[in-house]
């Protein structure tokens, strides 16, 4: 057991002669012995002082302090002013703690390198003589919070978690958190005022779902006469919380909803208690009116994003939505479709509420569009109906084979002037066909213009005439109608992965990835063996749980550290034109912590594709002419394994050699000399050991 750190236990005392012995007994018998007990007698008029002196003479670890009556907050502050421990905990003098209370919290705060360890509690109702246990014996768990997610749990009523989190007792704090903080004097609900400041100062909080603290409900303590003071006690701490969080730039949606409920409760109880004519009641009524007005204003200011798809694309739709919600708030999604179940829409709306967002069900009958010719899917024509459904003057249309990696406020702030839309140039159209057109996968739509000009009908009319005469379905139609009438956006806002080689594009400063990554072509990242750049980005968003989306509190752009929070995987590249790769299965099986990327400019055989049964193998299939994929493979691989038989891709070997990256080969596979480290085939174990050494 660790005993190096001294832990201070602060006990404020006032007229608790009937309870004090049990409290102090529970502290001096703690299994963790390196404690100091600061007992502050706040002017007691009963025998509490004598009991304190008796215990201080019995246990040298007790520091006994007497002061004139100044209240609970002042007594706790006196304890803080006189503590010498590295950690501090508070125990109210009418309560008691479990024998392993200090030891358990201390072990966890050290194990998790946290700033605060929080336990739960059970209650003893003195009037009833009954214990109330909020946690079942088999429901123990530990959960880590940061200084934002902890606030989301202050409203968690299950297992009385919210009370456990907001109370001063039941926690072990790093003492340094109180260097500039003290309890507010003269305020009801002082625990809440202090803890929300302490949580903001912390970086990590570990919560233990275990009852370690016994909270006594004394006779008469439940009776409350509703007064102006109690109205302020309920609302003011919440008001301060919102102010603190707003100043830190944290999301406020959930906190504002709770604040609104507290105002309603205070006003209802105030009216029932005859306080309707008081200044406090009128003040709270005004706050409620302003809050309702603000809510209506925020509702009208949601940013409109339009998606169009059929239900067979549900995974892709969800991935696109997740990527948007990870970096944005206050979004009104319009899903234009013909076959999404209403239940799916309802369930998704429950998810989106947490992001101050919603999804609008925009159903179009398939007969309206299925008659049109398209080489992709008739759903590409669904964007025609934007003006019929969207109420906002500006809307962002997004294809669902893309992800968003940053906040979109700057894009929405684009001045469209009198243009019907803004879009990114289709650099593939320029390179392959000599056409100066825009790509229709990302469109910032001047919806006020579209409504005024009845663009839905115009698009349908042009499509009726031309849909079977053009080669790119809706994109050709849109470019015909808006020729020379569109505002050009930066390639960053529609980074088509197969077009980067044609665009003069550099990542903007502060971004690890393009703002919007568009996986155009048949090489979709969700398809097996479909090689493309930024494949891991799509899978990152796809794999995010909804509870994880809210963790990007400051709405930062996607960073490589998000995808690889510990470290990027050590990767070996094999670039081959043959499925005969020497000792490949032995290497893959022996080195499960190393990633193997097998790339081929030709279509790989079934034999080689079978290697994807191993979780540390990725196949890059048929990547001829995909220069950016080659560059990504070279950049993200630490070792080149020249272990394939047959034709060599000499430029890849040269790139690794010029970069000074290791190249390992077998003697029977080395046919092009670039300074490889070669092994005999029967020395595969030596190659394995070499790779282990390099990977460290």
Curated annotation (Swiss-Prot):
Q: What else is known?
A: Encoded in RD10, a pathogenicity island with an atypical GC content that is associated with invasive pneumococcal disease. Pathogenicity islands account for greater than half the genomic diversity observed between isolates. The main function of this island seems to be correct synthesis and export of pneumococcal serine-rich repeat protein PsrP.
Output the Pfam families linked to this UniProt entry.
Glyco_transf_8 (PF01501), Glycos_transf_2 (PF00535)
The entry's protein name is Glycosyltransferase GlyA
Q: Which Gene3D superfamilies match?
A: Spore Coat Polysaccharide Biosynthesis Protein SpsA, Chain A
Q: Write out the ranges of the annotated region (GT8 domain).
A: 302-556
- Name any one GO molecular function: nucleotide binding
What domain of life does the native source organism fall in? Answer: Bacteria
- What is the purpose of this protein? Involved in the polymorphic O-glycosylation of the serine-rich repeat protein PsrP. Catalyzes the fourth step in glycosylation of PsrP in this bacteria. Can transfer the sugar from UDP-galactose to the terminal sugar moiety of PsrP-GlcNAc-Glc-Gal or of PsrP-GlcNAc-Glc-Glc (using truncated substrates with the PsrP SSR1 domain). Has hydrolytic activity against UDP-galactose and to a lesser extent against UDP-glucose.
Q: Which organism is it from?
A: Streptococcus pneumoniae serotype 4 (strain ATCC BAA-334 / TIGR4)
Keywords associated with the record:
Glycosyltransferase, Manganese, Metal-binding, Nucleotide-binding, Transferase
Q: Where is this region: GT2 domain?
A: 1-301
Chain residues that bind Mn(2+): 399, 401, 518
Where UDP is bound, by residue?
308-313, 399-400, 518-524
Any Gene Ontology biological process: protein glycosylation
InterPro entries per record: Glyco_trans_2-like (IPR001173), Glyco_trans_8 (IPR002495), Nucleotide-diphossugar_trans (IPR029044)
Q: So what family is this one in?
A: In the N-terminal section; belongs to the glycosyltransferase 2 family. In the central section; belongs to the glycosyltransferase 8 family.
Q: In which pathway does it act?
A: Protein modification; protein glycosylation
């Amino acid at each position: 057991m660790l005993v190096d750190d001294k832990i201070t236990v602060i006990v404020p005392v006032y007229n608790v002669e009937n309870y004090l012995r049990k409290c102090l007994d529970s502290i001096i018998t703690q299994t963790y012995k390196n404690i100091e007990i600061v007992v502050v007698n706040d002017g007691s008029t009963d025998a509490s002082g004598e009991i304190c002196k008796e215990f201080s003479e019995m246990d040298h670890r007790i520091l006994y302090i007497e002061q004139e009556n100044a209240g609970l907050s002042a007594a706790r502050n006196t304890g803080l002013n006189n503590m010498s421990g590295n950690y501090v905990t508070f125990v109210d003098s009418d309560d008691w703690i479990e024998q392993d209370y200090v030891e358990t919290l201390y072990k966890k705060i050290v194990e998790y390198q946290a700033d605060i360890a929080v336990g739960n509690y059970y209650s003893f109702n003195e009037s009833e003589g009954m214990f109330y246990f909020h946690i079942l014996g088999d429901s123990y768990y530990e959960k880590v919070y940061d200084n934002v997610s902890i606030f989301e749990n202050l409203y968690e009523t299950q297992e009385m978690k919210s009370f456990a989190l907001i109370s001063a007792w039941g926690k072990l704090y790093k003492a340094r958190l109180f260097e500039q903080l003290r309890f507010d004097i003269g305020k009801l609900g002082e625990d809440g005022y202090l803890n929300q400041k302490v949580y903001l100062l912390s970086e990590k909080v570990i919560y233990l779902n275990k009852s370690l603290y016994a909270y006594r409900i004394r006779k008469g303590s439940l009776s409350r006469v509703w007064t102006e003071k109690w109205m302020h006690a309920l609302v003011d701490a919440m008001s301060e919380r919102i102010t603190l969080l707003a100043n830190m730039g944290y999301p406020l949606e959930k906190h504002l909803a709770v604040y609104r409920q507290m105002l309603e409760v205070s006003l209802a109880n105030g009216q029932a208690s005859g306080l309707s004519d008081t200044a406090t009641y009128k003040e709270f009524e005004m706050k409620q009116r302003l809050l309702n007005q603000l809510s209506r204003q925020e509702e009208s200011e949601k940013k409109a994003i339009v998606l169009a798809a059929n239900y067979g694309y549900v995974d892709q739709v969800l991935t696109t939505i997740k990527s948007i919600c990870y970096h944005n708030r206050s979004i009104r999604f319009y899903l234009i479709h013909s076959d999404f179940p209403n239940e799916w829409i309802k369930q998704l709306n429950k998810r989106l509420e947490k992001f101050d967002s919603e999804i609008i069900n925009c159903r179009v009958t398939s007969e309206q569009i299925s008659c049109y010719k398209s080489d992709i899917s008739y759903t590409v024509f669904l964007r025609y109906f934007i003006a019929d459904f969207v109420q906002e003057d500006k809307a962002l249309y997004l294809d669902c084979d893309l992800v968003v990696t940053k906040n979109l406020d700057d894009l929405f702030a684009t001045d469209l002037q009198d243009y019907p839309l803004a879009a990114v140039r289709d650099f593939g159209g320029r390179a392959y066909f000599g056409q100066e057109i825009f790509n229709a996968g990302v469109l910032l739509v001047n919806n006020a213009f579209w409504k005024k000009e009845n663009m839905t009908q115009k698009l349908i009319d042009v499509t009726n005439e031309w849909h079977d005469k053009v080669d790119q379905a809706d994109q050709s139609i849109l470019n015909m109608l808006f020729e020379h009438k569109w505002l050009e956006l930066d390639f960053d806002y529609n980074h088509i992965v197969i077009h980067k080689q044609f665009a003069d594009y550099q990542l903007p400063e502060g971004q690890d990835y393009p703002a919007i990554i568009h996986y155009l072509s048949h090489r979709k990242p969700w398809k097996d063996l479909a090689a493309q750049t930024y494949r891991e980005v799509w899978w990152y968003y796809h794999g995010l749980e909804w509870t994880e989306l809210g963790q990007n509190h400051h709405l930062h752009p996607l960073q490589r550290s998000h995808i690889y929070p510990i470290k990027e995987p050590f990767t070996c590249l094999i670039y081959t034109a043959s499925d005969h790769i020497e000792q490949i299965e032995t290497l893959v099986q022996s080195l499960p912590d190393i990633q193997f990327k097998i790339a081929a400019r030709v279509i790989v055989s079934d034999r080689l594709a079978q290697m994807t049964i191993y979780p540390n193998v990725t196949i890059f299939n048929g990547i001829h002419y995909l220069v950016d994929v080659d560059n990504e493979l070279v950049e993200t691989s630490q070792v080149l394994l020249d272990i394939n038989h047959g034709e060599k891709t000499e430029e890849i070997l040269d790139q690794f050699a010029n970069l000074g990256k290791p190249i390992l080969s077998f003697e029977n596979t080395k046919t092009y000399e670039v300074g490889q480290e070669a092994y005999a085939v029967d020395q595969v174990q030596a190659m394995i050991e070499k790779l282990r050494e390099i990977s460290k």
